[in-house]
């Protein structure tokens, strides 16, 4: 395993540096033994892009992960002593307000050290963008327009407002940030 070789090399070199990684919750590194090795090699922070706390939404996004894998990866990293950052998005295709509330509950249940809550923006070249165009959720190809006529006041495509408008998405995102960072247990850390 290449990761083992890299970690062993860092341990043997005894450089005294710390570092961070971004990883998938479904990776082979998401076990206690590997997380402990990463920590010993100087890894002190790990980032996980989970995106949703609803399996149906994760499947629609084709993330190829499960909520159980996310829970396990965060737990393993925490047990190893790492700082854990998680990432979640609101406004995904077919995501309802109730799903966003479930995502917030899931994020809180993980007890990660940090969480970033963002609003989904479909970008050109992604399957999400192409599908939103095909389904009429984006009215026209904004990126093609920009590529053919770059202007300084370009605005990215509208959000996918299938089940929630921008005002609702912003309110949910702000609520998520408040609830995550103003928990008594979080404040007392």
PLM feature segments, named:
Residues 7-188:
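A structural motif corresponding to the C-terminal lobe/cap of the Radical SAM core domain
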